[in-house]
Amino acid sequence: MDDPECDSTWEDESEEDGEDGQADDTTDEDTGDDDGDAEEARPSLFQSRMTRYRNWRAMQDMQRYRHNYPDLTDQDCNGDMCNLSFYKNEICFQPNGFLIEDILQNWKDNYDLLEENHSYIQWLFPLREPGVNWHAKPLTLKEVEAFKSSKEVRERLVRAYELMLGFYGIQLEDRNTGAVCRAQNFQPRFHNLNSHSHNNLRITRILKSLGELGLEHYQAPLVRFFLEETLVQHKLPSVRQSALDYFLFAVRCRHQRRELVHFAWEHFKPRREFVWGPRDKLRRFRPQTISRPLMGLGQADKDEGPGDPSQEAGTQGRTCGSGRDLSGDSGTAEDLSLLSAKPQDVGTLDGDQRHEAKSPSPKESKKRKLEGNRQEQVPGEPDPQGVSEVEKIALNLEGCALSPTSQEPREAEQPCLVARVANEVRKRRKVEEGAEGDGVASNTQVQASALSPTPSECPESQKDGNGPEDPKSQVGPEDPKSQVGPEDPKSQVGPEDPKSQVGPEDPKGQVEPEDPKGQVGPEDPKGQVGPEDPKGQVGPEDPKSQVGPEDPKSQVEPEDPKSQVEPEDPKSQVEPEDPKSQVGPEDPQSQVGPEQAASKSLGEDPDSDTTGTSMSESEELARIEASVEPPKP
């Protein structure tokens, strides 16, 4: 049995002579401090008496509590458990009280009522010893067991603890560990705590009740908080003495109590006046893992030093873990952004290509290609290709598909284009010969199909809109401006077809009515596609795109009687009044739109023989004319 007059905190570490901590403290001379206290002058007799002073009444009271009131026996209360009934919300506290739920819900922010009413605290935090309120019954051992076994009662006890912490400007951060910290309104609440010293008695009661009702782990964090605020932060000077005399020794766990006493000894100034523990044992004592958790979250000790290595490692691990998580997200976010940016870039490229394919002017697309090639060159290096070569490449590329879907090499597309042209011509011949009963119309359609541009996706043919404006989209012995889009087979110029005239908007596309023979011979400068005619060339730099006068097949011989237009034939005359003989902007079929598939001329294919094709078609037309020519009037 411990001596009730002594402090049992250090009793198991007493020396062989049996002296306890208090005796060591009494006989200790202030010459062995390692922290600079030895350099101070020895205190006088009066100072020694003051430094050796300790509140013995407080020490005895707290030791009696820690030893579960050995001199106290439960009174026979006839089976009544008033404290348990109050916490079950069955009765009101006395005198003139309320139910516990009313207090927990309505008194939370009513600080004046919590300060002025002195009857509720004995009911909220009952003890085994009687208090000043004789209406409040002392706590019995049966009630203690009932408090610990009832979840409802335990929950209300924690809420009552949070209510009083808020009244003192403190916040419970973790219900599991009991860690506490300053509340947002701690300054006015600390001021009230300094002004009303009776709250020190309330805090002592709260600490004792927590130890009685199964919440012992809530004691040490709260005591550590008050030691921090009084000895380190110096915010609660009125609470300092009570914290050292009562709060420290309300902790029932001996090891935690030693940790707290050592913490108080380290921060007490002057240290030689510290009387709440034996100095020699405090010098030898080494804090363990309890120091850092006692403060609660966010209440790091500025003067303590390293503190708890395990908790620091845990905190660092959490920080590193969060840092790794953040870096992984950012990396994932970057990967996702890159993955999401790739299809956007592809879509942008496709959009640029579609915009370029639909550009109204082919010269602008050439200019953009040329500028793009120049920008790709390193500054200071000579241009490996001349301007003429770049223009040739641009012209050759115009003959190929520039749509977003055709990204294969252009050389592989040339045989496919020729094959598609031949198939298209054969299909048109079959359809037109079967559908049209008129020989003249059939003759005209055959010639139109033979002279129509090859189906291609060239942006030039899609951009020109009308034949006469683009001299490079047609190649043939006839006037390139005399052709209209492939959708209107009747708009072609034929020797026997009176509908082959170009409207008055194109003066060069008309057959002069003054020419009775209607022949297109070498004397007619417009019937030839020579070097003097800049509109008969595909490109000025492409030698394969010209049909020169040296080619005898490029002219229609005047000796061929079938190629002449008889003056007696009324169909060979130019009737300007005939609405069908004009191709104007009013005729929707006379325009070449970007939606026409067959918009490329055979002359743009350097591998195809344009002149030979035109001559063979002329002979075929002559044979068809001889067989189906109607009698002349």
Swiss-Prot record:
It is found in: Cytoplasm; Nucleus. Signal peptide: none annotated. Sequence repeats lie at residues 467-475, 476-484, 485-493, 494-502, 503-511, 512-520, 521-529, 530-538, 539-547, 548-556, 557-565, 566-574, 575-583, 584-592. Residues 351-374, 505-517, 550-580 have a biased composition (Basic and acidic residues). Keywords: Acetylation, Cytoplasm, Growth regulation, Nucleus, Phosphoprotein, Receptor, Repeat. The modification N-acetylmethionine is found at M1. Pfam families: OGFr_N (PF04664). Residues 1-44, 287-390, 404-633 are annotated as: Disordered. Expressed in all tissues examined, including brain, heart, lung, liver, kidney and skeletal muscle. The keyword Cytoplasm applies. One of its GO terms (molecular function) is opioid growth factor receptor activity. InterPro entries: OGF_rcpt, OGFr. A motif (Bipartite nuclear localization signal) lies at residues 257-286. Residues 1-38 have a biased composition (Acidic residues). Residues 441-455 have a biased composition (Polar residues). Residues 467-592 are annotated as: 14 X approximate tandem repeats. Coiled coil: none annotated. One of its GO terms (cellular component) is membrane. The modification Phosphoserine is found at S327, S340, S361, S365, S403, S452, S601, S608. Belongs to the opioid growth factor receptor family. Receptor for opioid growth factor (OGF), also known as Met-enkephalin. Seems to be involved in growth regulation. This is Opioid growth factor receptor. It comes from Mus musculus.
